[in-house]
């Protein structure tokens, strides 16, 4: 079984040297991602596509390959194909008939052929010959060139015939690391998750900067969002997660700053701190999830005042997006459930926020801050490799045990999202399994029998460890992490 990876059209429009560089990077990215699924993954770059071969003795890996390829930036679409050779146009027809005869029954169809190489026929001739044969010798409802029930796709590359079994839409965008790095200010909400994704999709290694205003519970939730985005869409490259303890800044704002100016000044302080962190990392741009007019600090006047707190470029990919569109996109990329479970901390500190900040007043208020305040919080920032999020959680989960087997009386809690649970249900003979999505666990765990012990399960063990830590901080000690052998 093979996959033919088609490049995003914008890549094909580049000059030859740039296209070559982008294609090489995409090949490397695909190899890096797939070899975490299967060390025997074979990836081969060609001029206008990339071939991925699934080992013949591992048919069970086909779906996993497809899932990962669909989430790698730079791919327009992926064709899951059956490869063979052919001797004539009639041979092409006979092979197509054998594969599609039953599937065409009762359906209208058309045949589409893409051809490269030297042949005695052209693509239209193959379409007519194969289409006519299928129409005559199958129980299809007939040929329909526009909006058919089914399209039979064939690709001919010199002597090779590729019968397309499935077309998988890709993520689009540019290959990871073909653009410069950015530092995304992430709060865990709808906006920051989507804005981070936009830059991952566009080919930038996206590092995460979190300003902790809500304690460990808030940080745990945000780490889940960042890890999800990286693991699903940016796993080909390592990135950093930076947690900045912003309590001292918030405390001084509450004690010293005029109520109406608090929101704008908080954002300015965040930009200053993030800029210094970015400079240390050699990053030239910040990314935020701000959208014009969404909240009081996001009027054009206030955004202008916020931008003038730093010389660094501030990018806002969501600036003219509607909130519902942002929520819809968060649903598509898998961050909606995280965002629903994370409270918004930034909006609670100012009761009467200004919508038209005056720079003179802002500067006067900022004179009240301690001189070394930003230096102190930046110095105290924790920088970790995002791959080590699970490890960092392990060091904190001192009272929570990880087990690979279930003992009598223990209950397994599947905390995966409903979609993941539906795709691969967890079934354990003779063992009670409860399905409680991670975003409902905090509220529903209190309703469970306190006399029982609960083993949290997810595919990779990261989410279960994060949730175990969260529950432990809430005072629940009848919880373990379940990692089956």
Swiss-Prot record:
Checking SUPFAM superfamilies in the record gives: Adenine nucleotide alpha hydrolases-like, Rhodanese/Cell cycle control phosphatase, THUMP domain-like
- What SMART domains does UniProt report for this protein, alphabetically? THUMP
Q: What does the UniProt function comment say about this protein? A: Catalyzes the ATP-dependent transfer of a sulfur to tRNA to produce 4-thiouridine in position 8 of tRNAs, which functions as a near-UV photosensor. Also catalyzes the transfer of sulfur to the sulfur carrier protein ThiS, forming ThiS-thiocarboxylate. This is a step in the synthesis of thiazole, in the thiamine biosynthesis pathway. The sulfur is donated as persulfide by IscS.
The set of disulfide-linked cysteines is 346-458
Where does this protein have coiled-coil stretches?
none
Q: Does the keyword Transmembrane helix apply?
A: no
Positions of the catalytic residues: 458 (cysteine persulfide intermediate)
Sequence similarity: Belongs to the ThiI family.
Q: Which reaction equation describes what this protein catalyses?
A: [ThiI sulfur-carrier protein]-S-sulfanyl-L-cysteine + a uridine in tRNA + 2 reduced [2Fe-2S]-[ferredoxin] + ATP + H(+) = [ThiI sulfur-carrier protein]-L-cysteine + a 4-thiouridine in tRNA + 2 oxidized [2Fe-2S]-[ferredoxin] + AMP + diphosphate; [ThiS sulfur-carrier protein]-C-terminal Gly-Gly-AMP + S-sulfanyl-L-cysteinyl-[cysteine desulfurase] + AH2 = [ThiS sulfur-carrier protein]-C-terminal-Gly-aminoethanethioate + L-cysteinyl-[cysteine desulfurase] + A + AMP + 2 H(+)
| Pathway given in the UniProt record | Cofactor biosynthesis; thiamine diphosphate biosynthesis
Give the originating organism.
Shewanella loihica (strain ATCC BAA-1088 / PV-4)
Q: Which PROSITE patterns match?
A: RHODANESE_3, THUMP
Per UniProt, residues of the Rhodanese domain are 406-484
Where does this protein reside within or beyond the cell? Cytoplasm
Extract the InterPro entries matched here. Rhodanese-like_dom, Rhodanese-like_dom_sf, Rossmann-like_a/b/a_fold, ThiI_AANH, ThiI_fer, ThiI_N, THII_Thiazole_biosynth_dom, THUMP_dom
Q: Molecular function (GO) terms listed?
A: ATP binding; CCA tRNA nucleotidyltransferase activity; tRNA binding; tRNA-uracil-4 sulfurtransferase activity
Q: Which domain of life is it from?
A: Bacteria
Question: Which residues are recorded as binding ATP?
Answer: 185-186, 267, 289, 298
User: What's the EC number here?
Assistant: 2.8.1.4
User: What are the alphabetically sorted keywords of the record?
Assistant: ATP-binding, Cytoplasm, Disulfide bond, Nucleotide-binding, Redox-active center, RNA-binding, Thiamine biosynthesis, Transferase, tRNA-binding
Query: What is the protein's name according to its record?
Result: tRNA sulfurtransferase
Q: Do you know which CDD domains this protein is assigned to?
A: PPase_ThiI (cd01712), RHOD (cd00158), THUMP_ThiI (cd11716)
Q: Where is it mostly found?
A: cytoplasm
Domain THUMP, by residue range, is: 63-167
Q: Which gene encodes it?
A: thiI
What is one process in the GO biological process aspect for this record? thiazole biosynthetic process
Task: Look up keyword Transferase and say if it applies.
Answer: yes
